[in-house]
Amino acid sequence: MGFTMGLNLLLLVAMVATNILSLYHLSSNIQSKPPAAPPVPDHLLHQLQTIRATINHLTRLHPPAPPSAKKSTVSIPSDLLLYAHLSPIASSCKDNPDLLYQYMNYTPFSLCPSDSSVAESLILRGCHPLPRRRCFSRTPSSIPTSLPKTPFSTLPEKALLWNSYTCKSFSCLSQSNPNMGFDMKVEQSRFLDYKSGLDLPIPQFIQLTKSSKSVIRLALDIGGGTGTFAAQMKLHNVTVVTTTMNLGAPYSETVALRGLVPLHVPLQQRLPVFDGVLDLVRCGHAVNRWIPVTMMEFLLFDIDRVLRGGGYLWLDHFFSKKADLDKVFQPLIWKLNYRKVKWAVENKNDASGVKNGEVYLTALLQKPLSR
């Protein structure tokens, strides 16, 4: 009896000791594990989640929402689902579902809704290309008997749909702001003479290119407004394509009425041009300090991509704070390693410029012939 109790006690002590040793061993292994890998950046996780959610959402394969989440009361437009099976939807579209659903909520094979402002809101938020495909674009009820034969002729107001704009005529636009580019009498003399050291008249630019034995045939005007730069260059047998956004006024339609080519694309989009085919890229007022620095860097290097060797980059009245030009934008521009043909900086003397210490920069830079 005493022997049996002693044996049981010994077994109990051995079992407890074994468990203690096992716990110690496990805890030491946990502590000796290698350090965890660095976390994935939040912005990258967000982009990956956005892309995954877009694919799942548009193909009805998304996992069930957690119990605490409220179910969406907005149904997905059927044409959006159809498009998603054929082409990828830009991931930024998912970040603006209300705008996207409003834009895609139309009746196929009928007239497109009058919602150009919704389309531009999506484009400016990175939702591009837009997915709407199967409706008929609207046209004016009364068509003008003739269209302008020269890019500086009077523009026929009946050739446009004005319902999306506050102003309902070109005269209204010209009176509200003569510098918007809708007064052809004013535009006819633009880019032709000096008003300050920041200006580079087109005749002088053509002479500069001839003296350096450069040929200018094809160009892109980024943020070109109503296309006046393209119109003036057309008189020198240079083909210029103008990128523009409407933003409350019929810029794209006006470019087309003048017999020129408008591209309705935002600044953040990759330029829809093949590599190394352009002789000139001009950046107008739309390219300025309000563009995020990273986007500006992408834009400059995309311009380098489409320019041929020996082609020109023309920054026309780029404005920023003087300190930012010295510390941020000038070093950014010099990354291209282009030859400096013109570099002029002057104070921006309007109220905003004086208040913020802003300056204008006009630069003409030439891409190296080879690299």
Map each language-model feature to its residues.
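S-adenosyl-L-methionine
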Residues: 252-270, 274-275
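A short SAM/SAH-binding and catalytic strip from SAM-dependent methyltransferases
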Residues: 268, 278-294, 319
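N-terminal accessory regions of S-adenosyl-L-methionine
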Residues: 2-208, 362-364, 369-371
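Conserved class I S-adenosyl-L-methionine
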Residues: 213-225, 314-337
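Core SAM-dependent methyltransferase catalytic element
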Residues: 334-371
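A short glycine-rich, Lys/Arg-flanked "PGG" loop and its adjoining helix->strand segment in the class I
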Residues: 293-310, 330
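Conserved SAM-binding loop of SAM-dependent methyltransferases across substrates and taxa
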Residues: 226-238
